[in-house]
Amino acid sequence: MDTAPDHREPQEQGESRKWYEMTASEFYVYVVAFMCGVSMMMPVNAVFSAPAYIMTYYRYAMQDPEAVPLYTNFWNNVMTYYNLIGIVTSLIMEPLTLLSWFRRIPMKVRLLGGLVILIVEIIVLMVVPARGTSEAGAVATICCTGFIGGFGKSIFESTTYGMFGAFPSSFTSTMMGGVGMSGVLTSLLQIIVKAALPDSYEGVKKQSKIYYGLDVGIQGMTFVALILLRFNSFAQNYFGDLGAVKSKVDAGKLSAEALCHTDEHPTHDKEGRNSSSGKEVPALGEVQTAAAKSEGPDAVEESSWPHEVEGPTSNEILVATAIFSTLRRVKWMFVACAFNFLITLFLFPGIAVGMFPDSKWFSTIAVFIFNVFDVLGRFSPSLKLMWPRSYKQRWIIVAASFARVIFVPLLLLHSYHYIPGEAYGYVMEVIFGFSNGYVGSMALVLGPQSKGIDNDGKRFVAGTLMGISILVGGTIGTVLSIMTQTIRATY
């Protein structure tokens, strides 16, 4: 994948380059971004696409189709427990990825290591029933895989969001599209498999093998694609050496003038580098000494590199990046992203698609519709017309995020059948899904483009912080959903 350096005309921020204008190396990075997005959510989607298998996992683990569970409360709420363990683990682990000792780990090790852990999660779910265990062993397996999945996802997700935060925004949009496409693929496969295979003991077992096999296959391809990315010249322009060796770019400095931004979207220079002031923005292998000093005490770590040294590695630059200073600069996009996913995971899937439990197809079709329009929303930032017209109009994204609170009464009323009919539910899933994808993706794209995020080290940290915002909002939303459904079941 090693090609000559890419020279192109300036590219507007938020506008993806036409496919016929791309070099092979640039197109390959888009493919990798998409595959990373798909792989990020595949384990969770694979598990949720075969609920009958997980809810009766004890039978397969005990190798007894007639087994009667002793831990009925656990198996009645196994999906909730699995999801909650994964989210809480991610919420604890992902902020730890910003600690200096973790940032010293080469990024390629983090990417590949996180992906391997996600693959191990699915392998464990498949191996335990093959070997056999007790019901208590099955419970322990579900809890352990929830923890393993949350641990691996926190490493892979934070590194992926951070890495593509250093690229032009269209790469983040593509990655977010991959996250949504993961749900579309599993939903579509669920419809096909549900129509083709019976809901018997053996039929459900075959369904699980299809979902889990697809997951491992996609993640295996992503693993290979990430290894090849190390030799991609376009990726090296933006992300240097992936933390493997000393950067080819000499240590330099960025003048304080680079901190001054206009209200216009940043553009890219002839090599596609992000530039908002007409000056070259150094790659993630250069030193931002003057810029760090201009930020004040919060950025004291960033001034630790001498002016004239051999180019440090990418992860060394990350260690020298101030976290709280970066968080202050992305705070509004952080809040918008967190609240967006709070509303989504509060209502979806339990409340938004669970109002017709006796219907064989409503929940399946409703989830599919949500996933399709969620993907469309996630890809929408690739269109320039979907962007705020100026930097000052970024408040629109924050307002749109908080405006999504209107879905709470609309879907709760439908859930309690005060608003009857399945057609209403399908229409709501269209709007609900698109708004989730658009607001979430736009916030993730705009976060690393905030004023003061003027080098790739800060963009990496900003991208990681935006990933954490998803977990913060998602955790609160999931807890609220559990509380709401518990009250609903009680009263």
From Swiss-Prot:
The keyword Transport applies. GO terms for molecular function: nucleoside transmembrane transporter activity. It comes from the Eukaryota. It catalyses: adenosine(in) + H(+)(in) = adenosine(out) + H(+)(out); uridine(in) + H(+)(in) = uridine(out) + H(+)(out). Keywords: Glycoprotein, Membrane, Transmembrane, Transmembrane helix, Transport. It is a multi-pass membrane protein. The keyword Lipid biosynthesis does not apply. Can transport tubercidin, a toxic adenosine analog. Sodium-independent high affinity nucleoside:H(+) symporter; transports adenosine and uridine. Can transport cytidine and thymidine. Belongs to the SLC29A/ENT transporter (TC 2.A.57) family. This is Nucleoside transporter 1.1. It comes from Leishmania donovani. The gene is NT1.1.
